[in-house]
């Protein structure tokens, strides 16, 4: 069974994940570059975004009824799969075939630009989770993420703009 996500009043199924934060920003910027007829370099977009353009919102994340509030959120994806964005192991312990059907909420938060830029490459090996002061992982069947201002997110790589809230129901 595939998980469902409700965004801007629309319900969709997804296979891998719902990404909010710098990844949604990268998809938004990448879409604009591709629409202009150029090739998007997502690594370059991410680095420039981390250093100069992406503005970290605050968010509240509720997993199975337990709400936590986060300041300066860099990432807040909810994953059915383990990887996204060209090989980033964002949810290292997530099992797509989990018999319980859980999804994983990952929040990278609270850090400054340079610390985030230093830790960000460790996502490719799933080692970012060692930075518990700025990365929190929670598993559940019902996840709601709310932001303090509209932002872009991606659902299996498809960009959705002006989102202030998304809700995931595990399959």
Q: Where is each model-derived feature located?
A:
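Gly/Ser/Thr-rich active-site loops/lids in small-molecule metabolic enzymes
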Residues: 34-44, 81, 86-115
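ATP/nucleoside-binding phosphotransfer catalytic cores, i.e., glycine-rich phosphate-binding loops
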Residues: 63-65, 95-100, 107-171
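A residue-level signal for conserved active-site and pocket-lining positions in enzyme catalytic cores
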Residues: 26, 76, 105, 157
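Glycine-rich phosphate/pyrophosphate-binding beta-alpha loops
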Residues: 19, 23, 75-90
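Glycine-rich, charged/polar anion/phosphate-binding loops
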Residues: 45-48, 55-65, 84-91, 128-131, ...
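Catalytic core of DAGKc-family lipid kinases
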Residues: 1-68, 72-74
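Short coil/turn connectors at secondary-structure junctions
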Residues: 9-11, 71-73, 98-103, 171
